[in-house]
């Protein structure tokens, strides 16, 4: 399974420098940046690159990392070709709590590491997670448009993105149990998350 996160932000220097910057950065570097930025109360970050390395500066922290020779995916084509006929609205806080509890059980699941079964039916989500010795079932209320659906998704992947959502409502757009899922903050059209179901 794979995932893609798209975030659009306005840059202060974007008017001065019209040149586009497209870089692939190691995931470990991004994870490190996120962890450090959560500890520091700083909203401004300086990013510079010569193409082979990227320099980040914020507060009194400086990070230099290499870039990866990997073409950025054509996310617009992926999103434009994604078809969805089901829309699920969930309370972000409740959904996050359910995902966190389920993640404890599914992290060592031998059949599908971090895999949970998401059953959307009658304006409810029943989330089931299984470990070697135990099973958890969590149910929360949803607003559901379209038919019922049962799908297996990576709980950890969802948790990583949904923990960044600031709005009260999380939106899931789905088609079937083999097609892509789009996750977004109802109040933020500049960020969305794309993931595939588990086999």
Question: Can you describe what each PLM-predicted range is?
Answer:
Residues 71:
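Feature marks short, surface-exposed loop/turn motifs that line or immediately flank catalytic pockets
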Residues 1-6, 14-68, 83-199:
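DNA polymerase processivity clamps
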Residues 75-77:
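Specificity-determining recognition surfaces
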């Amino acid at each position: 399974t794979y995932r893609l996160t798209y975030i659009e932000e306005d840059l202060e220097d974007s008017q001065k420098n019209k040149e586009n910057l497209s870089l692939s950065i190691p995931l470990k570097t991004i994870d490190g940046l996120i962890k450090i930025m959560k500890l520091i109360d700083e909203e401004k970050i300086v990013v510079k690159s010569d193409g082979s390395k990227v320099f980040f500066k914020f507060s009194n922290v400086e990070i230099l990392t290499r870039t990866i020779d990997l073409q950025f995916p054509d996310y617009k084509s992926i999103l434009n070709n994604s078809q969805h006929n089901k829309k699920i609205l969930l309370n972000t806080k409740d959904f996050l709590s359910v995902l966190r509890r389920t993640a404890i059980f599914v992290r060592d699941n031998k059949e599908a590491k971090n895999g949970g079964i998401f059953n959307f039916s009658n304006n409810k989500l029943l989330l089931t997670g299984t470990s070697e010795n135990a099973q958890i079932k969590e149910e929360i209320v949803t607003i559901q448009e379209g038919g019922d659906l049962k799908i297996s998704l990576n709980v950890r992947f969802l948790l990583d993105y949904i923990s960044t959502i600031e709005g009260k409502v999380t939106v899931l757009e789905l088609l079937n149990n083999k097609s892509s899922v789009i996750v977004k903050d109802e109040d933020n059209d500049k960020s969305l998350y794309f993931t595939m179901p588990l086999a």
